[in-house]
Amino acid sequence: IPLIVYDPEQVDIDIKGYKDLWDPSLEDSIALTANYRVINGITQLSMGESMNEEDVDVIKKTGEKLLELAPNVRLIQDDNTQNALLNGEASVAFLYTSQVTAALAENPDLKVVYPEEGLGFGIMGMFIPSEAPDKDAAYSFMDYIMQPEVAAKCTDYIGYYSTNKAADELVNPDLVVPDDVTKGEIVQNVSQDADAQYQKNWTEFKAACD
């Protein structure tokens, strides 16, 4: 779950959602993860649209809105994006939860925002190849990793949420999604035409940020 994180000592506004990222006061101060569907998606959520919109004309409007964000973007990178926030290069960052965890470990005064427009979810799965030499061992590992105590330790360590609800009670409370966060979407596959437009939006956006 990507979230907004910012340094309240460096930001003059109270960030509540994605739409606030377009505020002129944030010029050249935002670090973004490098995921074209996610960044298109948060733009759509800021516009009241679905992250999985497939109407190409609507997606083109998303691209226009995204270009308006470019002046506020300091950098775009996927790995260790939190470092830009920690070293002062950026004052606001849009981070994966693992990066949020790393950032808070270094600076607990950072403010984490669960955007009011809703969250975008991605799911990482475990899969067993059809020709796996020891499927029983693989199933045993999956059973182990999903035990509440083990799943909670994984969440505390890396920051990714567990699909085992029973683990929530054992996780660091700061890493549990607040009860009042009720809106969200899973990023899903879209049509080839829609995906092509999302990628076009992304290419044009990155060029505008350079």
Q: Which residues make up each language-model segment?
A:
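Extracytoplasmic ligand-binding site segments that recognize negatively charged/polar headgroups
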Residues: 1-89
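Short secondary-structure boundary segments
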Residues: 8, 34, 97-98, 157-158
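Sec-exported extracytoplasmic/periplasmic mature domains
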Residues: 9, 23-27, 44-48, 67-74, ...
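Short, hydrophobic alpha-helical packing/hinge segments within bilobed ligand-binding/sensory domains
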Residues: 18, 81-84, 100, 138, ...
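Periplasmic-binding protein-like
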Residues: 59-68, 106-130
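Conserved C-terminal helix/tail region of periplasmic/extracytoplasmic solute-binding proteins
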Residues: 83, 185-210
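A ligand-binding cleft/hinge motif common to bilobed small-molecule-binding domains
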Residues: 92-110
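Mature extracytoplasmic/periplasmic domains
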Residues: 119-120, 124, 129-186
